[in-house]
């Protein structure tokens, strides 16, 4: 699998707290990593519609978390957008 336990721990340690994996920044970073991986997969496999649907669902989940973070703490929202280079 492309996302190992070590890679998840690394992502959570960089963007949030290694112990608190439910933190919005960590979840957004994890979704961003998965989205970039699926995007690369879809460039090679254009007719993989199941993966395309999964990508759309992940983008929606990330968008919902970003909206939540924007509503709760605008400074954390702006920081995660800048760090992950998510266009807005």
Curated annotation (Swiss-Prot):
SMART domains xrefs: Ribosomal_S15
UniProt keyword Metal-binding, yes or no: no
InterPro entries, per database record: Ribosomal_uS15, Ribosomal_uS15_bac-type, uS15_NS1_RNA-bd_sf
Keyword terms: Ribonucleoprotein, Ribosomal protein, RNA-binding, rRNA-binding
Example of a GO MF term: rRNA binding
GO BP, one annotated term: translation
Coiled-coil positions: none
Highest taxon in the source lineage: Bacteria
An annotated GO cellular component: cytosolic small ribosomal subunit
UniProt cross-references to Gene3D superfamilies, sorted A to Z: 6.10.250.3130, S15/NS1, RNA-binding
Disulfide bonds: none
Subunit structure: Part of the 30S ribosomal subunit. Forms a bridge to the 50S subunit in the 70S ribosome, contacting the 23S rRNA.
UniProt similarity note: Belongs to the universal ribosomal protein uS15 family.
Protein role: One of the primary rRNA binding proteins, it binds directly to 16S rRNA where it helps nucleate assembly of the platform of the 30S subunit by binding and bridging several RNA helices of the 16S rRNA. Forms an intersubunit bridge (bridge B4) with the 23S rRNA of the 50S subunit in the ribosome.
NCBIfam families found in the cross-reference section: S15_bact
Listed name of the protein: Small ribosomal subunit protein uS15
């Amino acid at each position: 699998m492309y996302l190992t336990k070590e890679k998840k721990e690394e992502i959570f340690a960089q963007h949030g707290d290694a112990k608190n994996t439910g933190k919005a920044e960590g979840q957004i970073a994890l979704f961003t990593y998965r989205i970039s991986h699926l995007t690369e997969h879809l460039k090679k496999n254009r007719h993989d519609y199941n993966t395309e649907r999964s990508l759309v669902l992940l983008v929606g989940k990330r968008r919902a978390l970003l909206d939540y973070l924007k509503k709760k703490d605008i400074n954390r929202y702006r920081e995660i957008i800048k760090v992950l280079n998510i266009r807005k």
